[in-house]
Amino acid sequence: MKILRTPRMERCIGCHSCSLACARLVHRMLSWDTAGIRISSSGGLSTGFEARTCLACLPAPCATACPTGAYSQRKGGGVIVKKSLCIRCGECARACPVDAIFLAAEGEPFVCIHCGRCVSFCPHDCLEMGDVATGEAERSNARESAP
């Protein structure tokens, strides 16, 4: 099982190609609000950019918080999303320890599903799909340091 990782963000120029690829190819919409990966400044133009995306928690707190079962645990980490079951309550977003579930204006949640469609659209090779075992320590550290 592979998960999306962002090991080379120092190369990122903030072009948002990955976000647009996710929105268009995965969610079939053309809005940054519908992407499962978000790029933002680390604190100013001179400090670079950071990617906010699902860290494939095991177990996934968002799946546990979902009252309808729209979010369920994915083997290897992360979640499987069944949009038809979602009631747009936002509990999944509130439960995410790294704020990686994004709510569109009408309350629909969007999260990275670790499909890898964004990887080939990054012109500077900032993203990659990695084996679950490789990202295990990183995912554990993120959950421990989350507020």
Question: How would you describe each model-predicted region?
Answer:
Residues M1-I13, A23-R24, R28-A70, G77, ...:
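Flanking helices and flexible, charged tails adjoining ferredoxin-like Fe-S electron-transfer domains
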